[in-house]
Amino acid sequence: MSKQKKSEIVNRFRKRFDTKMTELGFTYQNIDLYQQAFSHSSFINDFNMNRLDHNERLEFLGDAVLELTVSRYLFDKHPNLPEGNLTKMRATIVCEPSLVIFANKIGLNEMILLGKGEEKTGGRTRPSLISDAFEAFIGALYLDQGLDIVWKFAEKVIFPHVEQNELLGVVDFKTQFQEYVHQQNKGDVTYNLIKEEGPAHHRLFTSEVILQGEAIAEGKGKTKKESEQRAAKSAYKQLKQIK
């Protein structure tokens, strides 16, 4: 592709990025960093640019910054959870499906600069590509403005999803319920599978929550894990109401 075409695409990106940051309530200093964050390798290849101008290095940095930010959030939010639980929660928050949700929610997926072939084959909707760009954006934001601004961005874009349980398995109800029971000194929690029905391709599982030797709630799901999650959710709500 021609230099003129590249210039048109880049200028269009910069205008859209400026508008997006204004919508989100953030400023920026180094637009080149953000352009790199959204430059997929296919875009770089199409215009014969330096192979290090794509977003993979920023993705590497952003991954570490995101883990640190989420770790601090969980450490403060759940003072009674052991390291193992915190690690599982963090892993789910920073996993690919969650990052895609964050990116799509604010339209960052629309900002990605792709090569012509990648665009035609549906690259813009590819989860791995979107999550990589989101991490690269976090890396660019960190380099441009520091960890405090990354934290403010996470408060606006990431943490609300976690707190409202909008991400499947992020603040999983079994963990949430276990933490609550521990805080209230109510004893041990166990789960029993009490029913499994339906054909092999469409099974329905029913599990119950046992607290202090008594079944206090049930949940149904397409998997044993899902039924336990739903049972924990029901039990958690019941105990919160009783309190």
Swiss-Prot record:
Write down the SUPFAM superfamilies for this protein, in alphabetical order: dsRNA-binding domain-like, RNase III domain-like
Q: Note the HAMAP family from the entry.
A: RNase_III
> Which CDD domains does this UniProt record tie to the protein?
DSRM_RNAse_III_family, RIBOc
**PROSITE patterns hit by this protein:** DS_RBD, RNASE_3_1, RNASE_3_2
Q: What is this protein called?
A: Ribonuclease 3
The UniProt similarity line reads:
Belongs to the ribonuclease III family.
Q: Which residues bind Mg(2+)?
A: 59, 132, 135
Where the record annotates domain DRBM, the positions are 172-241
Chain segments annotated as transmembrane: none
Q: Which cofactor does it need?
A: Mg(2+)
The UniProt entry annotates the active site at: 63, 135
What does it catalyze? Endonucleolytic cleavage to 5'-phosphomonoester
Where in the cell is the protein located? Cytoplasm
Q: Does the keyword Metal-binding apply?
A: yes
Q: Which UniProt keywords apply?
A: Cytoplasm, Endonuclease, Hydrolase, Magnesium, Metal-binding, mRNA processing, Nuclease, RNA-binding, rRNA processing, rRNA-binding, tRNA processing
Q: Which NCBIfam families match?
A: RNaseIII
Q: Where is the RNase III domain?
A: 10-146
Q: Name one GO cellular component term.
A: cytoplasm
Query: Which cystines does this chain contain?
Result: none
Q: Tell me the GO BP annotations in alphabetical order.
A: mRNA processing; regulation of gene expression; rRNA processing; tRNA processing
Q: Where is this region: Disordered?
A: 219-243
